[in-house]
Structures are given as structure tokens and as C-alpha cells.
Amino acid sequence: MQQDDSPKLFTERLVTERLFTDLETPELVEQAILRREGALSAEGALVIPPAPRGPCQRFIVDEPSTTDAIAWDEGNRPCTLEQFDALWDGVHGHLRQGERFVAHLHVGEDPEHYIPVKVTCETAWHCLFARHLLIPPARYNPSAKEQWKLLHAPTFDGAPPGEGLVIIHFARRKLVIAGQVAAGELHRALLAVQSFLLPEKGILPLEGIASIGDDGDVALFIGAPGSGRRTLAAGPGRSLVGATGLGWGRDGLFNLAGGCERPLLALPPRGAAPGFGTLVENGELDEGRRLDRSAAARCAFPVDQLGCERAGEPRHILLLCRDPAGVLPPVAILDGESAADHFLAGYGARAGLAEEGEGKPGARFAPGFGASWLPRSARVYADLLARRIEDGDSRVFVLNTGWIGGPAGNGGEPVPVEVSRAIVAAILQGALDGGEGTPLAELNLVLPRAVPGLDNRYLDPANGWRDPAAHRAAARALAEALGANLARFARGESPCAPARQRA
């Protein structure tokens, strides 16, 4: 029989192969369509239809390297080696029964502090998500580091019904994700790995974005999702670094991630629709294959267009807080210790609180401004922040990007973005570097006496309240809440309850 040596089309050779390694974006999109995992929108985005997404429980194997280092709580539950082995072996066997997609990626842009990871996925679209949110290197693992391995199996039936599991084994450098969970858990699990390892090297992992000016000055914007980080960091003549996670060490800032995951609703309504290569999870298409901008849809894409992988020491640090109480000023000055306290508190509006202030206002305290992938005690990261601020001689400010003049939904109005932009411009020009102002002792803040380009009536938050006494009462209540929250993180103590809940 004559052998057929003619070249095979990509789609033809897939018929005889079950393992696909390091496919590029177009190939993964093609595979996702062939496997009916999703469909293309009119603009070319890969749209994955809505599917059940259950709660995800993250476990970490309790072994010598983690026993006393992890802040054991509801977000980081301990499990045994036997439980990990059972899930790993089950998922490994499950994946070998069908086609699987492998990608060799890095977590972290830094040539010294990256970690290499082999990601094995059950679906093409999850592999595409991994390529977008992590870093496909030009050369994999050039320093020949010990490799991490991640298995991802959404249809594995060993997970609790309607839920998902993530288990991390630091000593073996392995992660396993099983069950119907949002794709973002893959990315967050690997950020948790870096966030455990980096502090041992004196590097602070954080959720933020940096901008670099034409003269090389660096500004770091830290805040919870929805606080306006990207909106305020972007500007004429400034390049961006980071979209999801950053590492801050002695040599400056570097990307931990290579892409961005955002709600579809967060994209400009009049901007270009997501195009080819963009992944839309929980998306729906109309008869014309146009995307429905639903609240559940999330898009993932690489951020090559940011143009920068690293930045030097930040000259200015801006902590962004969406204050639902309308108590905080639009801008205040912090020193390193007070900045660490505000970072520890992570005070802001609860997720989903409407910009218009509709509904009952609600606050939350999320250490690190809600970076759910920080597995150590929040005090570890706060102390690192204070050290980095001191070593870099950075100027620190807190900006209220929430409400002023009253609580959200009860007389308060959103801080105009024009006001926030004017404040950022003044900070970047160095107009507030002197640090002079009026102390607001109960909130551990200093009010600047003037901000160029900003009406002075905005500087004192009490000015916008109809009843000054109501503002004083609200400020006292916030100060007490901040104090009670910080009391959980006394220096040298773990912020978690001592009791451990096992898997």
C-alpha cells in the first residue's frame, strides 16, 4: 500500500491525535469550534455559551511548608495528602480518556522570578483562556527551573455536585482544578502560587496597574476591581504595566499575568466589539451573531497592547477606594504605615453596588483590596508594602472613587471622574509631594490644603453633606469599623481563626 506523504491540514491531523501541545490562538479557536465548545461572533470573538458555574472551594495540602505559613480560612482550607492524591489521580485518568490540550506557560514576566507551568486542559477554550491570562514565553523555562503542573477538568464528576474544587500542593508543585467553575479560577490559582512564593524573596504581589510617563516616572494604582484603576492609570503619554497582578521587588514592578479578564459590561459601550482571539465566557449571540452585553458575560484577552512588561520603583502610589459611606475625601495623603493599614483594611463598596447608588449601600473589608489569591496572612503583604514604600521613598495617596456628600443611595453622589482625573494629574506632576495638609486624625489621613485644577470645596468631605453632624457621625462609625477590622491583624498574629476546617 502506497504511503500518503502529502501534507495534512491542521483539521485533518486532529482526527488521529488526542494530545495537542502549545497550539496558537487561531488553532485553539478552530478546535473550540470543531468541538462545539463555542461559536464565533460577527466580529470574530470566541463565545462560550452560559453553563452552570458553581461555587469553588480552594484547598491547600497541609504539609511542613504550609502548616504555619498559610492563613487558613474559608478561602484557604487545609486538606490531606491522601485527599490530594485521590483527586489528582482521578482527574489524570479522566483527562487521558479524551482529547486534551497542553500549554507551557510562565507566571510572571521577571526572568528571575517567573514560574514555569505545564497546563493540561480538557477543553480548547480553557487552554485559550490560560494562554491569554498567563504568559506564553518566547522560550519556555530558560533557567531550567522545576516545573509546576496544573490539571483542569470541568466535566470530572468527582467534584461535589454543582461545585468545583481547587487543590494546591506546594511541595510537589502541582495544582488540580475539577468541576464546573468559572475559568478565572485557573488564573487565580496560579496567582495564589506566586503570591505564596514571592514574599519569601521580598517581593510584594498585589492587584494593581502601573503607568509610566515619558520621562520614566512610575505611578502605581492599587484597588479592588471596579475602583477605576485602569481608567485613571491611562492617559496621554503614559504606558501601562499590568492588568491583573503585579510583583513589586527591589528592582521595581513586573507583570505577574499576561492578560486581562473583565466583565463584558465594563468595556466601552460604543467601543469596538471584542474581535478575533478574544474569549467571551457566558456569552450569548443574537440571530445576527452579535454579542448580548449581559451582566454574566466575561471576556479574556492578552494585553500585548500595553507595551510594557516592567517598570521601575513607583514614585507615586494611589490607593483607590470606592467609599459607599461618602465619608472619605476625594484625595488624602498617607505615610507608609497608614498606607499599610488602609491596604490591610481593603475598605470599599461591596461588589455590584450600582454607580448610581441604587439600593442599600454596603461596605466590605477585603484585605489587599479583595485580591482573593493572597494565601498568607494579610499582615505579611501589608508589612511588605510598608517596606517597599520606605525603600523606594514613594509618595502615597488614597483616592475616593466612590461617593461624596452622603452615603450611596441616601443623598450621596458619585465622585465625578473629572475630579479624580484632576487629582491624578496633580499627583503625577508632583504638586502634592510636600505632604503638607490638615490631619484627619480619626481616619489616619491628611487632607491637602490645595490641589491644582480642583475646586477647594471638594477637599473637605464634610462640605458636601447637608448636615455636618451627620458627616461627623458617619466618620466616627467608619473609624470604629476600620479600627475593629485592623484589630484582627495585630502585628505578629495571624488574621485567621485558629480552627481549621478540613476537606
Feature-to-residue mapping (PLM):
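Short coil/turn segments at secondary-structure boundaries
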Residues: 102-107, 203-205, 398-401, 436-440, ...
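Glycine-rich, often acidic-flanked micro-motifs
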Residues: 2-44, 199, 207-224, 234-236, ...
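Conserved glycine(s) of the Walker
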Residues: 228-229
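Generic C-terminus detector
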Residues: 458, 463-503
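N-terminal accessory targeting/assembly segments
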Residues: 1-141
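Charged, amphipathic alpha-helical linker segments immediately N-terminal to NTP-binding catalytic cores
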Residues: 145-197
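Gly-rich Lys/Arg/Thr-decorated short loops/hinges at beta-loop-alpha junctions or inter-strand turns
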Residues: 69-72, 169-175, 363-368
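Short histidine-centered catalytic/ligand-binding loop motif
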Residues: 73-80, 176-182, 372
